[in-house]
Regions:
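Aromatic- and acidic-residue-enriched carbohydrate-binding clefts of CAZyme catalytic domains
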Residues: 50, 61-65, 101-144, 177-211
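Short proline/glycine-enriched turn/loop motifs at strand-loop junctions of beta-rich domains
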Residues: 371, 452-453, 461-466, 530-537, ...
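Sec-dependent signal peptide cleavage junction
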Residues: 19-42, 47
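Active-site-proximal helices and loops of the catalytic beta/alpha 8
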Residues: 46-64, 80-86, 99-102, 106-121, ...
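Sec-dependent N-terminal signal peptides of Gram-positive bacterial secreted proteins and lipoproteins
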Residues: 5-25
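Low-complexity, disordered linker/stalk regions enriched in Pro/Thr/Ser/Gly
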Residues: 503-592
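Substrate-binding cleft of carbohydrate-active enzyme catalytic domains
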Residues: 131-167, 227
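Aromatic-rich carbohydrate-binding modules that target alpha-glucans
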Residues: 546-554, 604-650, 662-671
């Protein structure tokens, strides 16, 4: 494998929901390029949609609001962030998988490196709690806290597969299905070769993992018991990872006596089935049968729409007809939309490089303003950049970047919450294709000028006559005699509405100074603290006493830590209205690998005699540090037959892959092992 970096691949599948309701008013103004859409259900008893469901303006139904994907956040972190999430206008959170999972890589807690975020998606059992996210009790507390704020909880589930390390599968699961051989389809350990072949797509393994026999009633019973436990703890729905790899009723059967009834059972035989919000991940890269999965689950993802939006936001054009096209063919428009998913971010799409934060925010605002679809916002790792996709801390369990609290994201979410039940009218003015208008009934108007030049408005609108405040910039715009006038600067977003506006004070911000690194070398490190719009700000270390601080104060941490130990700094703040914010940072005291350090490798039977060590570090630098181009540096053979590699310079956070050119020590597309001085490595 000739590659310098090893990007994790994971599947993500989403499961059904029953989506959007909209008004049936067919009147529209002729404003040039016009695309009016409505969903399959109609709402006629809510002409203003001015009443939201709680003090934060959040919606009681997940389908009506916006979802925040708390990617690799721990249950405790989500609990502490709940008021931040509510203030940002998200009505629903989505967790990473909460089931027991594979603890490879020495159970490391880095997103990528000495730890692997995608072990979330390698189940070893279907019971609540894992080493990455937290305990069942912490999950239950998280759900209870969410409900206090009016926030719903979606849980990512992955019943399609398990880890390929069968020794890690729990005895309870093996016994429940009658033996390990009965856990998988007959060819479940074979990789899919043709995704358009439904036999392969539904009965063979995806992403190097083993395909579970989801038609087996013993497995179904065990899995449904897990779902009901998750629901009892407070979950309000599920996202089904790799949904298109679980058979539909008319798909090929592995065992003629076992019908493809998985979807029927998990959508009807769970507690509160009619109240759950569920959707399935059906990536549009072959064999997806989108309409059929929407029919049996309730809703799916719309990955091709996200791909289009990522391209569109990078141009100046923003055609209404293309923006409203969900790219799902004739399927019902019951979809979860996104600008990027965690697969787009971590996989071949490399959206961390293709889209900067400004583009993510602007594109998101369009999804949130629309009536059709339920938008999901992926929370990128904290401090992530195009040069450093895993961020400045690279830790599983930490909250993601503060981008989900960006003022445009917040304004767009609150607009969405206020406009529930109002039909969308999406159009371009006659004189430009670079400006997008989204009217919501007669009560709200979203405008995005995607060009670099200002746009002077003087055009007809369905918006009622009156003066409207732009909830992004604060300026006022007037509608008189059915026309709106005013100027919109290049790349500016304007969100106009009065009815349903929830007036919340600006939140406090507490954080560490931008650029602060989570891993440090030396006896200690000094951290600069930031507090903005906070009447009170405190820090605590590892759950200790809270100490007040002011903007710019510094603290020193790490003096009493051993190398590789971690410490958590928690910052709390409060604004004048009493709204609270909280964020925790996980720091690790790093022991550098010094020049002259040796590591060893036991060559497996069947490998060639020439073995190389490929060492790399991509944890924080703008460029990946490597010891040599692939396959690395040839190792020397010791007297006892083990292979040895000696470091010729100091490294901060290196990983290593051993290879003979045809075989390698880590799995395909998995990161290397953390380097530990004098360790003897063996292939698992």
């Amino acid at each position: 494998m000739n590659k310098k970096r090893f990007v994790a691949f994971t599947m993500t599948a989403m499961m059904g929901l029953s989506l959007f309701a909209g008004c049936s008013d067919n009147t529209k103004k002729e404003n040039g390029n016009n695309s009016t859409t409505s969903t399959e259900q109609e709402t006629t008893n809510n002409p203003s949609a001015s009443t939201t469901d709680n003090a934060y303006g959040l919606r009681d139904n997940t389908k009506d609001g916006a979802i925040l994907h708390c990617f690799a956040w721990s249950f405790k972190t989500i609990t502490e962030s709940m008021e931040d999430i509510a203030m940002a206008g998200f009505s629903t959170i989505q967790t990473s998988p909460v089931n027991a999972c594979y603890d490879g890589g020495d159970a490391g807690m880095e997103l990528f490196g000495a730890g692997k975020w995608y072990y979330h998606y390698q189940p070893t059992d279907w019971k609540i709690g894992n080493y990455q996210l937290g305990t069942k009790e912490e999950f239950k507390e998280m759900c209870e806290t969410a409900h206090k704020y009016g926030i719903k909880v979606l849980v990512d589930v992955a019943p399609n597969h398990t880890t390929k390390v069968t020794e890690a599968i729990s005895e309870d699961l093996i016994n429940a299905v009658g033996g390990l051989d009965k856990l998988y389809h007959s060819k479940g350990m074979n990789a899919i070769g043709n995704y358009n072949d439904r036999t392969e797509c539904t009965l063979q393994g995806v992403g190097g993992l083993y395909d579970v026999n989801t038609e087996d009633p013993n497995f179904q019973n065990y899995y449904i018991e897990y779902l009901n436990d998750v629901i009892a703890c407070g979950a309000d729905g599920f996202r089904y990872d790799t949904a298109k790899h679980i058979g539909l009723p008319d798909d090929p059967q592995d065992n003629p006596s076992l019908p493809n009834n998985f979807w029927e059972r998990v959508t009807t035989e769970v507690t509160n089935a009619d109240k759950l919000f569920m959707y399935g991940e059906c990536l549009q890269d072959g064999g997806e049968r989108l309409a059929d999965y929407i029919d049996v689950i309730g809703a799916t993802t719309a990955s091709s729409y996200g791909q289009f939006m990522r391209g569109a936001i990078s141009t100046s054009s923003m055609l209404a007809d293309t923006v409203t096209n969900l790219r799902i063919g004739q399927a019902a428009p019951n979809v979860v939309t996104w600008i990027e998913s965690h697969d787009n971010y971590t996989g071949d799409d490399k959206t961390y490089q293709a889209l900067d934060n400004d583009k993510v925010v602007r594109a998101w605002s369009i999804l949130a303003a629309r009536e059709v679809g339920t938008p999901l916002f992926f929370a990128r790792p904290y401090g992530a950049t195009a040069e450093n996709m895993w961020g400045t801390f690279n830790k599983i369990g930490m909250a993601g970047d503060n981008l989900y609290k960006d003022p445009i994201v917040v304004a767009s979410n609150r607009f969405r919450n206020a406009m529930v039940g109002l039909k969308e009218n999406v159009f371009n003015p006659e004189d430009t294709q670079n400006v997008l208008f989204i009217e919501r009934g007669t009560k709200g108007l979203y405008i995005f000028n995607n060009s670099k030049s200002a746009y002077e408005m003087n055009l007809a609108t369905n918006l009622e006559n009156g003066t409207y405040v732009d909830r992004v910039g604060g300026n006022s715009y007037t509608v008189a005699d059915g026309k709106i006038t005013g100027s919109i600067a290049g790349k500016q977003i304007v969100i106009l509405y009065n009815d349903g506006y929830v007036d919340l004070s600006a939140p406090a911000t507490v954080k560490v100074q931008d650029g602060t690194q989570g891993n440090f070398i030396g006896d200690s490190t000094t951290v600069t603290l930031v507090a903005d719009n906070a009447t009170k700000a405190t820090y605590s270390i590892d759950g200790g006493e809270e100490v007040e601080f002011k903007n710019g104060d510094t603290i020193t941490i790490g003096e009493n830590l051993d190398f590789s130990e971690m410490t958590t700094v928690t910052l709390r703040g409060e604004n004048a209205a009493g709204n609270k914010t909280c964020i925790s940072y996980i720091f690790k005291k790093q022991d550098p690998i010094k020049e002259g350090t040796k590591i060893y490798f036991v060559k497996p039977d069947g490998w060639a005699d020439r073995v190389c060590a490929y060492v790399y570090d991509e944890s924080s630098s703008s460029e990946v540090q490597v010891n040599a181009s692939w396959p690395g540096v040839e190792m020397t053979i010791e007297a006892d037959g083990t292979y040895c590699y000696t470091f010729t310079e100091e490294w901060i956070n290196p990983l290593v892959i051993f290879t003979d050119g045809s075989n390698q020590s880590n799995g395909a597309m998995e990161p290397g092992a953390a380097v530990i001085a004098d360790k003897i490595y063996e292939v698992e």
